[in-house]
Amino acid sequence: MSRKLLSLTALGAASLMALTACSGGTASSSQSSTSAAASSSSSAPSSVTIESDQGNVEIKLPVQRVASLDNRTFEVLAQWNVPLVAAPKKLIPSTIKAYNTDSVADIGMHRDPNLEALAASNPDLIISGQRFTRFDSQIAEMNPGVPMINLEPRDGKPLNEELIRPVNDLGEIFGHQEDAKKLVDDFNNALNRAKKAYDGKSTVMAVDVSGGNIGYVAPSKGRTWGPIFDLLGLKPALEVQGSTDSHTGDDISVEAIAQANPDWIFVLDRDAAISKDGSYTPAQSVIDGNAALKNITALTKGQTVYAPNDTYTNESIITYTEILNSI
């Protein structure tokens, strides 16, 4: 055999060995990639247990068809791009557009809900709470086997803890733990900033403006603002016996407000959240336009804080972060 032929034969063998080695490396790499993916998939939790107000609830993961009845969840879920199959659409704040679609079944208002529409949406998780809590037993009966959680703030628990708890739970359910942590951190930072900003002696009154009327929001128990008094250690300008948690505030005369002469006034504009654009008188116009209030310290010094317009139908941890940052 000639030397040239031997060389060509050796070259061919070497090329074949190299090709085989490359092929083997690719296969090995592919197998490693597949193994890594399988490992990642197998490490994902198949369920999570949530401490609902009614006890522990096991939820199979991933959740595919969510129905939420708790208006405190809508903004958080929308930020995380979590789709819903059913919700009380008229209770969704107008600032949230994600669920204003035909793909979301409308179960109506809490006064007369369409629970049949909820069941027909075939949810694999129901988030109840707040206005719909009283229907929990009926909802459970109509949706057998479907996990339902209620993360309504519990009586006697600090508001900050009860705002943080549902966000962390939702983060675990939908795999948004880092996003939940960010919301909690933002809230805690706002809370700490507001605590440092308060001088400890200025008097504060909270009011709820609805239908052009000014209602008294009681410290601790009143709507939205009540728990803020406890969180920040605010000094009430006036304490009314027999006060309630009425959604429009308790009856009070503007003369009583003027006599209390608060250094600060915190305002919830209920109509801004539930009325159509332009069909109501804004709370600021009601407050600023009242002759009996024009000389109180809060107004003369410009120390009036208005909650975001969608607060009454929102009240999520995001809303409270905005409120605290405005104080």
Task: Please report, for each region that a protein language model flagged, where it lies by residue.
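Bacterial Sec-exported substrate-binding components of ABC uptake systems
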Residues: 2-13, 18-72, 177-209, 268-280, ...
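Short helix-initiation/N-cap motifs at beta->coil->alpha
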Residues: 52-54, 107-114, 243-252
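Extracytoplasmic substrate-binding proteins
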Residues: 56, 144-212, 303, 310-327
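A short, structured surface patch at a secondary-structure boundary
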Residues: 65, 70-117, 125, 131
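Alpha-helical, coiled-coil/dimerization segments enriched in small aliphatic residues
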Residues: 91-95, 218-248
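Proline-aspartate-enriched helix->loop->beta-strand connector
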Residues: 122-128, 144, 257, 261-266
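Ligand-binding pocket segment of bilobal, Venus flytrap-like solute-binding proteins
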Residues: 198, 211-216, 234, 245-274
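Structured C-terminal subdomain patch of bacterial secreted/periplasmic proteins
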Residues: 263-327
